[in-house]
Design a protein with these regions (language model features):
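Ferredoxin-reductase
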Residues: 1-64
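FNR/FR-type flavoprotein reductase catalytic core
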Residues: 57-189
Length: 189
């Protein structure tokens, strides 16, 4: 689920790589969510979440104009991207929501970005148009081949590396096993 929240004080200071903590009501737990985007002029912060527990289901039930009990941020250390000319951002599963602001920030800075995103199937694909606008080259992978190319994001990265594509950095966000394979693939480069 994609949600914009009016929070001018957070939107004003937000940077890629940071997150917020929110709590819906007195009975709710505080949960961290990555800042997927922000609009300083509109004063909005965008979050993306999957309904997996009480808090995210309750969050999904909110309507425009409803309020949250707590919405704190930006928290965390912003990502640093200085001196990069060509980067590959790899996002798998829920990690794509976190990878998106990284790719967008780099692309907005004039960095050439190859963005590899992976999903289980076409029904779980989110933000494809936004991804397309946040990179130079977009590679969509699905485990079952129902959209884009069939296979894992690591196969697309390996194909790029084997083709001689050189990156100043590779940023991987997703399941631990995916990030480990990305690290193993890039060690020799």
């Amino acid at each position: 689920t994609y949600m914009e929240i009016l929070a001018p004080h957070i939107a004003k200071k937000a940077q890629p790589g940071q997150f917020i903590m929110l709590r819906i009501n007195e009975d709710g737990e505080r949960i961290p969510l990555t800042i997927a985007g922000y609009d300083r002029e509109a004063g909005t912060v965008t979050i993306i979440f999957q309904k997996v527990g009480y808090t995210t289901y309750a969050l999904d039930e909110l309507n425009e104009g409803d309020s949250l009990l707590d919405f704190v941020g930006p928290l965390g250390v912003p990502s640093e991207f200085e001196g990069l000319k060509k980067v590959c951002v790899v996002g798998g599963g829920l990690g794509v929501a976190i990878a998106y602001p990284q790719a967008k920030a780099l692309h907005d800075m004039g960095v050439e970005v190859d963005f590899i995103v992976g999903f289980k199937n076409k029904d779980l694909i989110i933000l494809e148009e936004e991804f397309n606008n946040a990179c130079t080259n977009l590679f969509v992978m699905t485990d079952d081949g129902s959209n884009g190319h069939k296979g894992f994001v690591t196969a697309a990265l390996e194909e790029q590396l084997n083709a001689g594509v050189k990156y100043d950095a590779v940023i991987a966000i997703g399941p631990l096993i995916m990030m480990k394979v990305v690290c193993d693939l890039t060690k020799q480069y």
